[in-house]
């Protein structure tokens, strides 16, 4: 009897040990599997879009860089324009935004204030310049002024008003933007004596914002027209003094 009981007890212990080992191994497998799932979930939450998320970040970064680059380039362009105007306009430097410092005629002052009241949008301002150019009457070809990207016509006439010489200007051009600039000058400087025309600082164009979208050739053409108008005004003054 004792031997049989001992065998039964041994078998029972063996069954318990086997069952316990099976349970332990299964529990370990379950924990390992659940841990992998947890890791996968964490990875998916951290980067749900995979590579697309990285691409979006790099794209926004590149756009930000381009925007900053444009701002830096615009600053350099403004500095270059100031130096160019200072060099080509007879050493008349740019001053503050105070309009009084430019000795403008009443017509030019009105034009500057008109463009300053517009939104700071180069396209909008360029369209306004083109619209002003439509007011220029046609002119004969023999009156053209060279030195600009487009063919330009500028012609003065002198009138005597109460013993004073008054200059009137007409102008035209085959370029849309240049034609508008010609109109600004001939309209703004017509009806005034040569002394008043000579006092006008040609850098006033920077107050309007027009110079921001002009090419270098058009800027040179603008200053060439101003130089011709001032040269004629000087000759009128010299002839009047003789």
Curated annotation (Swiss-Prot):
Main location: plastid
Coiled-coil positions: none
Known pathway: Cofactor biosynthesis; iron-sulfur cluster biosynthesis
Chain's role: Participates in sulfur mobilization (SUF) pathway for iron-sulfur (Fe-S) cluster biogenesis. Enhances cysteine desulfurase activity of SufS. Probably functions as a sulfur acceptor for SufS.
Active site (UniProt): 148 (cysteine persulfide intermediate)
The family this protein is said to belong to: Belongs to the SufE family.
Name of the protein in question: Cysteine desulfuration protein SufE
SUPFAM superfamilies: SufE/NifU
Cellular component terms per the entry's GO annotation: apicoplast
Cystine pairings recorded for this chain: none
Subunit structure, interactors included: Monomer. Interacts with SufS; interaction enhances cysteine desulfurase activity of SufS.
Presence of the UniProt keyword Transferase in the record: no
Annotated Gene3D superfamilies: 3.90.1010.10
Record's keyword annotation contains Plastid: yes
This protein's UniProt keywords: Apicoplast, Plastid
Localization (cell): Plastid, Apicoplast
InterPro entries: Fe-S_metab-assoc_dom (IPR003808)
């Amino acid at each position: 009897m004792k031997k049989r009981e001992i065998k039964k007890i041994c078998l029972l212990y063996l069954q318990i040990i086997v069952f316990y080992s099976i349970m332990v191994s299964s529990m370990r497998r379950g924990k390992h599997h659940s841990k992998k799932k947890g890791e996968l979930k964490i990875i998916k939450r951290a980067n749900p879009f995979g590579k697309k998320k990285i691409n979006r970040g790099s794209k926004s970064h590149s756009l930000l860089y381009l925007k900053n680059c444009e701002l830096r380039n615009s600053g350099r362009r403004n500095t270059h324009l100031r130096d160019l105007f200072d060099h080509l306009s007879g050493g008349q430097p740019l001053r503050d935004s105070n309009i009084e410092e430019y000795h403008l005629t009443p017509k030019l002052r009105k034009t500057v204030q008109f463009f300053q009241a517009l939104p700071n949008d180069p396209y909008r301002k360029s369209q306004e310049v083109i619209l002003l150019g439509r007011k220029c009457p046609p002119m004969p070809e023999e009156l053209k002024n060279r030195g600009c990207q487009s063919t330009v016509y500028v012609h003065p006439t002198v009138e005597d008003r109460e013993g004073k010489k008054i200059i009137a200007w007409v102008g035209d051009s085959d370029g849309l933007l240049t034609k508008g600039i010609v109109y600004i000058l001939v309209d703004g400087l017509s009806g005034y004596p040569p002394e008043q025309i000579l006092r006008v600082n040609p850098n006033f164009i920077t107050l309007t914002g027009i110079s921001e979208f002009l090419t270098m050739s058009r800027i040179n053409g603008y200053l060439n027209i101003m130089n011709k108008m001032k040269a004629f005004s000087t000759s009128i003054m010299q002839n009047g003094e003789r």
